[in-house]
Amino acid sequence: MYRAITRNIQVTATPRYVAERSEPDQGRHFWAYTVEVANLGQETVQLKGRHWVITDANGHTEEVHGAGVVGEEPTLPPGGRFEYTSGVPLNTSTGIMSGHYEMLADNGETFSIEIPAFSLDVPDVRRVLN
């Protein structure tokens, strides 16, 4: 679990390797990640956009920009939480994701909050040798 707090908004990310959607022999790996955004502050905020930076083990970087998350632009009152799960494919067995969300406060102010960097790693495969 990876966590960052910006301006009383907590973002927690938990990645998980999805073996059933991966084909390691063909260099295709897939991870699901669950993100929870929690409003720990006193103002109502709305998540308006996202910016992800995804880097594989070869240093290839892809940037993803978009409105909201998973088709929604959730509003979080004080104490409110929003959780979603999405996925990312890579051509390498490791990588890293990071980024930020664009938020809108009740007073019309826009600001960015950090999405913590998190690693994408194929779980260790233990081999037993006799």
Curated annotation (Swiss-Prot):
GO terms for biological process: error-free translesion synthesis. Gene3D superfamilies: ApaG domain. InterPro entries: ApaG_domain, ApaG_sf, Uncharacterised_ApaG. Residues 3-127 form the ApaG domain. Pfam families: DUF525. NCBIfam families: PRK05461.1. HAMAP family: ApaG. This is Protein ApaG. The lineage of its organism: Bacteria, Pseudomonadati, Pseudomonadota, Alphaproteobacteria, Hyphomicrobiales.
